[in-house]
Amino acid sequence: MSEPSSRPLACLDANIFLAVLIPEATRAPKDEIAGSARVLKAVEEGRLRGVSTAILLGEIRYVYLREDKAGFEIARAAIEAESNLRVLTITASLAIHAAELRRTYYSKKNAFSYNDGLYLATGLAERADLLITTDPHLLSVANLKTLRPSQYR
């Protein structure tokens, strides 16, 4: 395995995990679901380092509840046990930066959410090489290179 610094660091949005965990609950096309599986496999194998924000777990939990699905605790344990993935606590500075990013990107035509701001703020704070998402609001940001999971090779 290569040195950690030589492997790209990707900030991962919840939709990457949800596409694999509960594909029937996502609006993502099949190529994005397959791409999400490739991304998570690369993290698991150590070819890609991942980082996300603790809101990830809240978003995943919500979908499990909304879809009335069992298995959240198993998914959570797997995420928390993954050695190539860091899930950051939401600190005051991260929360404030997320609000500032929301102010920058939100408009009537772009419903950039506070959660979107948390993912972007996390990626920027951790100096991620890219942010992988299917969210059109995040794919249009200028602060960080973004990639659809289907584009990850």
Model-assigned labels for residue ranges:
Residues 1-52, 65-74, 136:
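Short, well-structured N-terminal submotif of metal-dependent ribonuclease cores
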Residues 17, 57, 95, 138-139, ...:
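A generic structural signal for short hydrophobic patches within well-formed alpha-helices
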Residues 3-5, 85-130:
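Active-site neighborhoods of divalent-metal-dependent phosphate/nucleic-acid chemistry enzymes
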Residues 19-21, 63, 141, 149:
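Residues that scaffold the ATP/ADP-binding catalytic core of kinase and kinase-like folds
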Residues 1-9, 120-153:
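Acidic, PIN/NYN-like endoribonuclease modules and their adjacent C-terminal/linker elements
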Residues 14, 54, 113-117:
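Conserved glycosyltransferase catalytic-site signature
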Residues 49, 84-86, 145:
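Conserved beta-strand segments of alpha/beta enzyme cores
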